[in-house]
């Protein structure tokens, strides 16, 4: 095709997946132990990151800046290719706005090229799932403007249902109080979080125990899923729980493909180890 799809590393695709989909990627970064780390979800590196969190290491995150975006865009523009950007939700990061700034500058330098930036309103492998569909449409021959319109129409149907195992990280991020974290831990309370239509993380329920939390995720899948061809599952270094969740989903539905990966460091820094997420296309978020 005559255009290049570019995303950012919050999509949590591995380098191999990015190559498979022919997508280039702007990097967000995570700071811990005094060093900046790019947010690529290579399994060994992400597992090491979660082990750092378990040992008490604090991590902070930084958005992809305009220069990072411009570098990726310019590489395509110099090959006379248009650019379609799928960016991490603007509700959680300035990464999208940085892409908009970079695109505005480059349009002046490359007036004959199209540069379209989409705020996915998605995060982690939810962003990855939307990217999966975008690449499929591209490969089927959809032109850049038509694909951008398709993304705007369908992005609010990418469902993200999350359960967090360790409340201490939500406490550190200010999403729950110290008292709530303490009582919740004592009572084995597991919060349920989802990404709403504005791309925000919303606390929406509390259940007792990990099994009940996974059953809640399956319930939301049953209520709203509209496409059983492809489902993504992500985890914070708890592959056994991810496999259990997949089995629970497959028990009730004829899902063709389940893609499992890590919740990368940008989101994982805030949710901690043990986070578990299911992503799918649904009738509503």
What are these regions (language model features)?
Residues 4, 10-18, 23-24, 29, ...:
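Mixed-charge interfacial surface used for oligomerization/domain docking
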Residues 3, 81-85, 231:
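Generic beta-sheet signal
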Residues 54-85, 89-92, 97-102, 148:
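Glycine-rich phosphate- or other oxyanion-binding loops that anchor nucleotides, phosphorylated ligands
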